[in-house]
Amino acid sequence: MEPLRDVHVGLSPPSRGPVRLALLSGHYLYYHYGCDGLDDRGWGCGYRTLQTLCSWPEGQPAGVPGLAAVQAALEDMGDKPPGFRGSRDWIGCVEASLCLAHFGGPQGRLCHVPRGVGLHGELERLYSHFAGGGGPVMVGGDADARSKALLGVCVGSGTEAYVLVLDPHYWGTPKSPSELQAAGWVGWQEVSAAFDPNSFYNLCLTSLSSQQQQRTLD
């Protein structure tokens, strides 16, 4: 069963006041725990977020690698030691950026957010990314090791700021985007509540690769 597409569509903005709001361009598929029949609960969130990134911007499963293919690629390119294949070892944004290049997906640009800083200092970068046609942004940390994807940003007055979070930790077979929205698997979250100030974070910001740009022109 193909994953659901663009599951954030229909969500209301998080703030009613004057805001600057930017969402990702293009389309994506929502990959989550067990969506292909493999029980990866407890270790697969980084792989699932990577798969969502690979499905952008067409929102199609073609070209999206399975978990075994990701592990094989990382081992073959020397990023992981022999025996990584078939393991339950996690991956993060650095591995995701390597795999995006390896599998011919969108371009991935890494950004490091030091411990204790939080994402407030990255709001302008994220806003410019989404407003400029960027795709989903993978986020992962150390104290907060739960990988997730960001699909948009909303900056209000003062310190009010929200990010649109897509959580890959869902287990089951969702019937509709509204089901996921109601349960909070995709939704707007206040930045200070969504991210642990005691964790560093890596971001992997996706944009069209040169090959994808050429296909768009064609």
UniProtKB/Swiss-Prot annotation:
Instruction: Spell out the protein name for this chain.
Output: Ufm1-specific protease 1
GO MF terms here are:
cysteine-type peptidase activity; deUFMylase activity
- Job of this protein: Thiol-dependent isopeptidase that specifically mediate the processing of UFM1 precursors as well as the deconjugation of UFM1 from target proteins. Mainly responsible for the maturation of the UFM1 precursor, a prerequisite for conjugation reactions.
| Principal localisation | cytoplasm
How is this protein annotated for GO cellular component? cytosol
Q: Which organism is it from?
A: Homo sapiens (Human)
* GO BP terms, alphabetized: protein maturation; protein ufmylation; proteolysis
State the UniProt keywords alphabetically: Cytoplasm, Hydrolase, Protease, Thiol protease, Ubl conjugation pathway
From the Swiss-Prot or TrEMBL record, state where the protein is found.
Cytoplasm, Cytosol
Record family assignment: Belongs to the peptidase C78 family.
EC number assigned by the record: 3.4.22.-
Q: What is the effect of changing residue 45 to A?
A: Abolished isopeptidase activity
Q: Where is the active site?
A: 45, 167, 169
